[in-house]
């Protein structure tokens, strides 16, 4: 099976960007509580 590198990159970005966004919001909320 041929692996499409662009597809892998697209999936990686699609997963990592929202995850990073949620982590940033989570950290912001914690620092505000402190």
Curated annotation (Swiss-Prot):
Quaternary structure (record): PSII is composed of 1 copy each of membrane proteins PsbA, PsbB, PsbC, PsbD, PsbE, PsbF, PsbH, PsbI, PsbJ, PsbK, PsbL, PsbM, PsbT, PsbX, PsbY, PsbZ, Psb30/Ycf12, at least 3 peripheral proteins of the oxygen-evolving complex and a large number of cofactors. It forms dimeric complexes.
Alphabetized SUPFAM superfamilies for the sequence: Photosystem II reaction center protein M, PsbM
Membrane topology according to the record: Single-pass membrane protein
Its biological purpose: One of the components of the core complex of photosystem II (PSII). PSII is a light-driven water:plastoquinone oxidoreductase that uses light energy to abstract electrons from H(2)O, generating O(2) and a proton gradient subsequently used for ATP formation. It consists of a core antenna complex that captures photons, and an electron transfer chain that converts photonic excitation into a charge separation. This subunit is found at the monomer-monomer interface.
Similarity field: Belongs to the PsbM family.
Subcellular location: Plastid, Chloroplast thylakoid membrane
NCBIfam families: PS_II_psbM (TIGR03038)
Organism field: Welwitschia mirabilis
Pfam families: PsbM
Gene: psbM
A GO biological process held by the record: photosynthesis, light reaction
Bilayer-spanning residue ranges: 5-25
Upper classification of the organism: Eukaryota, Viridiplantae, Streptophyta, Embryophyta, Tracheophyta
GO CC aspect terms: chloroplast thylakoid membrane; photosystem II
Major site of localization recorded for this protein: plastid
InterPro entries: PSII_PsbM, PSII_PsbM_sf
The protein's name: Photosystem II reaction center protein M
Assigned keywords, A-Z: Chloroplast, Membrane, Photosynthesis, Photosystem II, Plastid, Reaction center, Thylakoid, Transmembrane, Transmembrane helix
Highest rank taxon of the organism: Eukaryota
């Amino acid at each position: 099976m041929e692996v499409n590198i662009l597809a892998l990159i697209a999936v990686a970005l699609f997963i990592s960007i929202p995850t990073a966004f949620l982590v940033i919001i989570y950290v912001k909320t914690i620092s505000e509580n402190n």
